[in-house]
Amino acid sequence: MSKIFVFGHQNPDSDAIGSSYGYAYLKRQLGVEAEAVALGTPNEETAFVLDYFSVNAPRVVESARSEGVNQVILTDHNEFQQSISDIKDVEVIEVVDHHRVANFETANPLMMRLEPVGSASSIVYRMFKENNVEIPKDVAGLLLSGLISDTLLLKSPTTHASDPAVAEELARLAGVNLEEYGLAMLKAGTNLSSKSAEELIDIDAKTFELNGNQVRVAQVNTVDISDVLSRQAEIEEAINSSIKSNGYSDFVLMITDILNSNSEILALGSNTDKIEKAFNFVLENNHAFLKGAVSRKKQVVPQLTESFNV
């Protein structure tokens, strides 16, 4: 069998990198020639993780076919618009994910492992256990980091009942204190001062097709929402430019306070009435407070989907 690429979504976060790195390692232990690659450079949080566990960043690829690869495995995503550029020209043979299934179609049967847990890394951990393969320290560290990132250190409503035990076991294997390491890791991802507005709105962004509309939903983590809002003018300029150049109908930016577990929603586009309806708030100067919201997957995208489909 020829080489298989394993990768997470575009604009990869710690779970996209961690789950693909871990699953590629597992596949190699099972006799498959698999390489973890990335669809973008790691963000600052993930760079902290890679440095902490002395792991080289996976190489960034633009397409699979240009690398001579015809089969791919997706982790932490399934929607084609979030995947590799030539996704429709290669065979998807596996998916390991914890998101909704949408805009996904294959010509051949495949293995799909979908679970409503806190992270794709949680699923990969279970697959190691099921195959009786030992998890080395670096893999444990990256899987743990993916789980911490996606659940905000197990505080997000996306946290599954099984996730705390998974986190404790991975922390033990990685040789770290869960709380101390988790907080340091999350804080590493909140250093936004060096980012341009264009970079800021693209750190962790995904496009969703909602009733024929291409809606971009981005999220940045911070310890002070006001610091981000102080740059509102330049952020809005970057958002409007992104809308125009990419054909988005709307752009929603979640500015998430990781210490107090709240978000400010900044929204621009042609359907702001639907966005207001989704969250039962009124945008003032294009933004509004969303108490208790920290999860794009559970507290933003489902609400937008329902509102746009009415």
UniProtKB/Swiss-Prot annotation:
The keyword Protein biosynthesis does not apply. The keyword Hydrolase applies. Keywords: Cytoplasm, Hydrolase, Manganese, Metal-binding. Its cofactor is Mn(2+). One of its GO terms (molecular function) is inorganic diphosphate phosphatase activity. Its EC number is 3.6.1.1. HAMAP family: PPase_C. This is Probable manganese-dependent inorganic pyrophosphatase. It comes from Streptococcus thermophilus (strain ATCC BAA-491 / LMD-9). The gene is ppaC.
